[in-house]
A protein has these predicted regions:
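Beta1/beta-strand and adjacent pyrophosphate-binding region of the FAD-binding site
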Residues: 1-12, 150-160
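Core beta-strand elements of the Rossmann-like FAD/NAD(P) dinucleotide-binding domain
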Residues: 2-4, 108-116, 230-239, 276
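Rossmann-like dinucleotide-binding cores of NAD(P)H-dependent redox enzymes
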Residues: 72-78, 82, 145-146, 151-155, ...
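Flexible, glycine-rich terminal cap/loop adjacent to redox cofactors
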Residues: 7-14, 18-35, 40, 47, ...
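FAD-site-proximal beta/loop scaffold in flavoenzymes
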Residues: 134-150, 234-307
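N-terminal Rossmann-like dinucleotide/flavin-binding domain of flavoprotein oxidoreductases
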Residues: 2-4, 41-111, 189-213, 220-221, ...
């Protein structure tokens, strides 16, 4: 039996960053991975999609060339993670972990035990119960990233983050893209006005949207759906991408042997990422809280801090997010509507890229920024659409963590010319 201070199951951003941090805190760590180091983010998520989005924007590589470059980027970063996990206090084990009891896991018939365990197994594409969804023409986001030949046409079921990013990417590679969404608007988790602007811009590029529509069945290359009037419609495509969400990777772990609470939506945890067994933690997608790589990372930091008895000031309620369409959109905090629904007296101020010198100079004048301010002048939300939107929102994330006010933002000198001046201007 191999004993260490901490076992981590999963080596995505949550797992490998937690392993590195725990080692630096003096703990001996065993990290177990059933597939490839880096998890979904590095292998089939954040990084490969951003590599493809970059090539899509430049129009300099074919799809096949872009896929090859994506693979090179992923391989390089995997080596970096493997190097990080090769340090003295970390033992990397490749294989499927199964719990024997609340302190012990079995991997390749060997036993590993630890005082504390962090589950960081991530998630996988969720396939809805649509008749014909197992057809050869139907693919997941994981499979799309392995296609060496660009399909002539693609129908995407789902207009969330994954669906919209792939719609934007494949459209730039001259693939005919159709998106079917059951809700009234795309990107239902962000500001509705900005979501509408994203969709309208993509429609101008030739992407076709069917909103408030429910897919009923898939037959070969045909997708049959019911439109908002109740009439049956049909769309044909060479490939069909299911992008209707993700579900936690919990099968095969034998979690029942730990007596921790979990549901199909994820493992139940408290604010310190502890399960109902306080020495077992769950971070990232597998707890179903926030399906974001950076959320997993900071949940991992919180878990390790709890283990070593260190207090931190990580505010998990201020969690920025971005959608890397072209142009991108990003957000943090509350929308005005959400603030009002919570009984918060708030106002919204807007700034537009079309008045920004840098945006005009680089031909990126389509965009806007919204700040949500409460009655005490505190910034409680920011929602941006346009080039460098994620960077703008990151600035506001810093301000919100410092409980900054709109008037304080107005006094911060911003570099000229930058798109970030939109923030400074709307604060005045």
């Amino acid at each position: 039996m191999f004993t260490s201070d901490l076992i981590i199951i999963g080596s995505g951003p949550g797992g490998y960053r937690a392993a590195d941090y725990a080692a630096r805190c003096g703990l001996s760590v065993t990290i177990i991975e059933s597939k490839h180091a880096g998890g979904t983010c590095l292998n089939t998520g954040c990084i490969p999609t951003k590599a493809l989005a970059h090539d899509a924007k430049l129009h300099q590589r074919s799809w096949t060339e872009a896929i090859n470059r994506k693979n090179e980027v992923v391989s390089q970063l995997i080596k970096g993670v493997e190097t990080l996990l090769s340090q003295k206090q970390i033992t990397f084990v490749h294989g499927q972990a199964k719990f024997k009891d609340a302190h012990t896991v079995v991997v390749n018939e060997a036993l590993y035990t630890a005082r504390n365990i962090i589950i960081a197994t991530g998630s996988q594409p969720a396939i809805p119960p649509i008749k014909g969804a197992q057809s050869d023409t139907v693919i997941t986001s994981d499979q799309l990233l392995s296609l060496t030949e660009l399909p002539r046409s693609l129908c995407i079921i789902g207009a969330g983050v994954i669906g919209m990013e792939f719609a934007s990417i494949l459209n730039r590679f001259k693939c005919k893209v159709t998106v079917i969404e059951s809700l009234k608007e795309c990107l239902n988790t962000i500001d509705n006005d900005i979501a509408k602007r994203v969709r309208k811009q993509m429609e101008r590029r030739g992407i076709e949207f069917y909103l408030s529509c429910n897919v009923k069945r898939i037959t070969g290359n045909s997708i049959f759906f019911e439109d908002k009037k109740g009439a049956e419609q049909c769309v044909n495509a060479e490939k069909i991408l299911i992008a209707t969400g993700r579900r936690p990777n919990l099968s095969g772990l034998d979690l029942e042997k730990t007596d921790i609470d979990f549901t199909p939506k994820g493992i139940v945890v408290n604010e310190n990422m502890q399960t109902t067994k306080p020495h077992i933690f769950a971070i990232g997608d597998c707890n179903g809280r926030q399906l974001l790589a950076h959320a997993a990372t900071f949940q991992g930091f919180r878990a390790v801090n709890t283990i070593v008895g260190k207090a931190d000031k990580i505010n998990q309620n201020i969690m920025p997010a971005a959608v890397f369409t072209e142009p991108e959109t990003a957000c943090v905090g509350l929308t005005l509507q959400a603030a009002e629904e919570q009984g918060i007296n708030a106002q919204e101020v807007k700034g537009f890229y079309r008045t920004n010198g840098r945006a005009l100079a680089i031909e990126a004048d389509e965009g806007m920024v919204k700040l949500v301010i409460n009655e005490n002048d505190l910034i409680i939300g920011c929602h941006a659409y346009g080039t460098h939107a994620a960077d703008i929102v990151q600035e506001v994330t810093c301000l919100m963590n410092l409980s900054a006010t709109r008037s304080q933002l107005s006094d911060i000198v911003h570099i000229h010319p930058t798109v970030s001046e939109v923030l400074q201007d709307l604060a005045r």
